[in-house]
């Protein structure tokens, strides 16, 4: 493909299935273009005109016939028979196209209307890389491997429970439209919009459950202190959700609401704490705190609320609803009604029984054309008996799709078992949560494992390479779709690009080839090389890893304490400096696009944070070494302690000054947050005070938080290494896409 397109190759992502170069070139004039359209709907024709104007064509003229047009687009019976036959040979003809550039213009034949639009975005992507409008003569025949290519960005994420909002959750309508344009031009055809926590839309029947006037403490650089503000979701300030659903649908993009099945379901559990699942005295004595999200399904008020919620969401125009089971794995509601109904069952079987019951109830009230899906059965044991899967399959409404199937666990054998039990047509998503892990870890560069030490490479698994292997395995086994959980956009665009590439053309590129191509697609040739290099080398360290007295975070369990840890951190310091130099060079480039600048700037903030965390860890290790060696030079120990605290505070300053939502929240009665550096600072002070006295007195009132997503995932401490060692058998069954 790159040979056929030459210097234009990086402009296309996903790369086409087939491109053949011909002789000559065609020059398109930006001041005017004559267009002939046949067979498209009015909405599709409107998208054609909108895209051409966006591409810079000043005047659009309608040609009387195909031969008089600079650009001819046709679908249906007007497509020559030989081209229809060629498109029908592809996996999904209705989304496929043939684009021919030559003879003074371009012709697009679509297997369906959306296929024609994909041909158009391919043409315009090429033209965006041609300042003079000249393109090589080329013949492209192209179509997707997977019918549904989905990404899951966040509209809200644990809002009113663990977070107020960050990243995409703060976007207004125009920014969401720009993102939908990005998805359309990268041939993504569904968005699974995450709405966890207080609802980001009006809900007159339950106004207390929407994200309005939430009290949030945010940092003021001007006064150097926290201030309390009132936060209302952008869609409630200036509604845009229904408009962007229509806008996306016009571009062939389905919009799904991704919500909790019985947890984080709007603000009801916070506004009505009596409605929560109840913990037994035994569980309370054991220290359980995480009943703040789950609702008691035996209560009539809860059932009425949940039914009203799904009906309201459908009313907004969503094309489907994707429900997620609670991630709790150790207990189920202990109220008398639940004990009577489910007390004879293990906690997870009780949870699944309620899930089935709710899904049947939702099916009754939702329209037949509304897609219904579920993420469930995700808890240990990861490897489940076939009979267990078959039992739950038979209880599930046939209409319900699966938005979770196993990742690489058990060398993909568990995934292949799910394909056989549930059928590939029912599987729309696997466990592709690399960007979700990055968000859970507090917006750090958790992208590829190349930057991890060997001890963590043997543990880490939810990264970009893992996502790609899962996408390929889903394509190989004929699954209906693939889905990338894009919970973090800024600086993590590669996860979205991977979903676009591997859902469309799963075998065109190795992982390394994809990274090289995607980096240059995003930043151009010179800056793309810089970006690829820094992604391969930028260290990824969670704050808890530089503190030996805090519990291990489930996703990043190892500690960089001791001689080996200090040496690793010293190597990382040099890598962080090198990455920062590359980022400064990128940001100094004239004429960066808004997307390029926001990506580079977000990555720069992450790199600066990594440098400060690394330096804090280095000085803390040096302090421990001096102390443990029995050296009693108090002045030297104080210098090391001060340096460790300075760099830890610098990390916290970067967080507070560049992100909106950074302080722990106690709306649920439990301190919850995503940034652990205040705890690290307090633990450092405890260590220093033992030897150096009151000057380092810790804050006795410091909040010790639980992570918004980390509590139910402690089982990963056992399973992480097994998953990291797993072989992606479903993804290596042959580059021809052999079926399982």
Predicted regions, residues:
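Substrate-binding groove of N-acetylhexosamine-processing glycoside hydrolases
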Residues: 1, 5-15, 19-22, 27-31, ...
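A short acidic (Asp/Glu
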Residues: 45-46, 202-205, 267-268, 332-336, ...
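Feature activates predominantly on carbohydrate-active enzymes
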Residues: 11, 15-21, 44, 87-304, ...
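Acidic, contiguous N-terminal accessory segments
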Residues: 1-111, 132-142
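Short, Φ-rich (hydrophobic/aromatic) sequence segments
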Residues: 44-52, 117-127, 309, 342, ...
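Active-site groove signature of glycoside hydrolases
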Residues: 291, 305-341
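Short, well-ordered beta-to-alpha junction loops that form the rim of enzyme active sites
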Residues: 196, 260, 323-327, 375-377, ...
